[in-house]
Amino acid sequence: MAEAASKWLDNRLRESLPEEVKVIKPAAGYSSCPDHTLKRDIMMLLSGEYDLGIKLTESFAMIPEASICGLIFMHPEACYPEIRRISREQYEDYAARRGMDEETARRFLGHLLR
């Protein structure tokens, strides 16, 4: 269902945008957007207007399990980044910007360290 909804949205956006505009939809927790904690922020932004019936576990797994959340970008030069490894400096900078303590950063970003 989530995949079908994503495809439907993709088709609607492509129909309404000029051909040269690319649409990308990086999903939190996947390689182009590996920080699972972003799900909390996305859900908080939506919770004021919508009761989606989606819950997050302590480890940011979504319930129901078929749920997915992400961001949508539309631009002629939009492309998916592939984030496999980051330096210690990038790790510390990102954690500081997100307001993560060391334990949270290690838990959700540690696998990305070179």
Question: Residues of each region from the PLM?
Answer:
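C-terminal anchoring/interaction modules
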Residues: 112-114
